[in-house]
Amino acid sequence: MYWNILGEFDLMNSFFIGNVEIEKTAALAPMASVADKSYRLMCKEYGASYLVSEMISSKGLCFGDKKTARLCEIEKEERPYALQLFGEDPYYMGKAAYKLNEYSPDIIDINMGCPVPKIVGNGSGSALMRLPDTAAEICREVVKNADCPVTVKFRAGWDENSINAVEFAKLMEQAGASAVTCHGRTRTQFYSGKADWDIIRQVKEAVKIPVIGNGDVVDGESAKAMYEQTGCDLVMIGRGSYGRPWVFRDVKHYLETGEKLPEVSIEEKMAVMKKHCELICKYKGERQGMKEARKNCAWYVKGLKGSARLRAQCGGLNTISDLYEMIDHILANELGE
């Protein structure tokens, strides 16, 4: 329990999705081109209780695309872990789910919430919220072919005039989903404005399966607030983890004690950035790894002295030595050495 004896906040320490037990702290959201293996491992090290992969193309998997297959690779340290599929065709989604079994994910998640035009234009992601019958058939096919529990991630609705998260959640439950994740924004909002947590509350009250809440959780206080206001079984953090994987440690500490941890020191921040970039290079090679590390470095240096200049400098990082040199300069500047 968190807080307990008349200390108001009262929360069980874990819950189950099917037969998979998950600690009730905070999960890392699936984020394409962001939450790769290195990113997930950093968040796991800092306490993320549940991880979801970058979205995996069902057709890419079925047609043997090697890049797609690499997205399915799991490190044992990542568990409990979900592989997330996207696609618009029930047949290929079912076939892809069957192929995912060989990677032994703890959970298979279905993406019905991505707002990106390229995905929506193909009838995938949040476009499926306007095609509930197809969405239900996709869920049934994935459940039928998966060897593990299946979950579905979706949004509040397509736009403010078509909020259908409650009905959609019920449909997914009927189609065999073991849990759902609701992002409190509509597709047309993308990531602007505020997430409507009341919609997450309504979803939680409407179904018997676990509900994960997503949108605007950025620290311990907002995590506690989402738990209290929605009754959700788990909170999920996406953009709030950019350049701050320690947010999961902060959330867990706050839920357990009601106290905020001190701000991360510049020394720890730089050590984490260094380790993160080294992991990226380990899995993707130095040349490609440093290209992909640039955006992460830009997030890590946000708020530091001369951050605009530092972010520009991040865009020119080509080697791990470049990174080490930049870190030395940052520490000297911040610590006055």
What is each stretch, according to the model?
Residues 95-108, 112-124, 133-209:
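Alpha/beta enzyme core
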Residues 31, 56-58, 86-88, 113-115, ...:
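Active-site beta-loop-alpha junctions enriched in small/polar residues
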Residues 26-30, 51-53, 81-85, 108, ...:
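Hydrophobic faces of well-ordered beta-strands that scaffold small-molecule active sites
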Residues 11-16, 31-106:
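Glycine-rich, positively charged N-terminal anion/phosphate-binding segment
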Residues 15-26, 59-80, 114, 118-122, ...:
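N-terminal small/glycine-rich loop or linker at the start of catalytic domains
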Residues 6-15, 22, 26, 32, ...:
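Alpha/beta catalytic cores of nucleotide-metabolism and tRNA/nucleoside-modifying enzymes
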